[in-house]
């Protein structure tokens, strides 16, 4: 892989997929995200939902220069010829009211979902995925309550990592670790992955790319490729497609823990 060897080097991919950046919140790792966008370029950029956190608009709204920089970098890619597709999620659902109009704003296409054809000929369904989260669909109050608890966990995470940084330790997500320890959370993730894979299979796709649950993953589920591109709150991950059609999850936080700039491969799809 032609990874950046210095902060001034840019890597060109065929496609990049990012989601769950949650701009407008303190939890957003806009510094990592801006660095990623500065040092990568692509033909296709998919913003797979929860890019701006509309749930925080009325309270706890946070926006600094690094959040502005993220938007500037996305717009610069659109102006430079990158095909940018924005698929709103549940936290930026205010944009969904405009979906029937098929709008294109500043070179960015607004879509409910998208179909991506890889260079290797695989047809991928691209969607945020909240439609397959029963709590979000049928119990909005519980979803908001869960969002509040999650925000508290992330706030603790910030202070926890500030102490680690002063002690010379790298970034580590306590909230991600806790999520992996709770059996019900693990079961919920499994149900979500199966539901998305089943939807892709039902509609004749080779795979599905989604976000929503902040859990980067790439694996085959009953012959269908399931990919979650992760988030930019806890894990700072993105899905990239190389020019030969190979798909890879890149952990940008892990990359920035190193003294050299070589993305760590999280996973490749297991063979069926």
Predicted regions, residues:
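Core catalytic region of metal-dependent phosphoesterases/phosphodiesterases
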Residues: 2, 8-14, 23-119
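C-terminal regulatory/interaction regions
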Residues: 2-3, 252-272
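Active-site neighborhood of phospho(di)ester-bond hydrolases with catalytic His/Asp-centered motifs
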Residues: 18-19, 45-49, 85-90, 111, ...
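Anionic group-transfer/hydrolysis microenvironments
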Residues: 21-22, 52, 130, 253
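Conserved beta-sheet core of the metallophosphoesterase superfamily
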Residues: 102-113, 130, 134-144, 191-253
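Structural motif
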Residues: 119-120, 221
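Hydrophobic, well-structured mid-protein blocks that either form specific transmembrane helices
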Residues: 120-128
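Active-site-proximal loop/helix segment associated with metal-binding centers of metalloenzymes
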Residues: 127-192
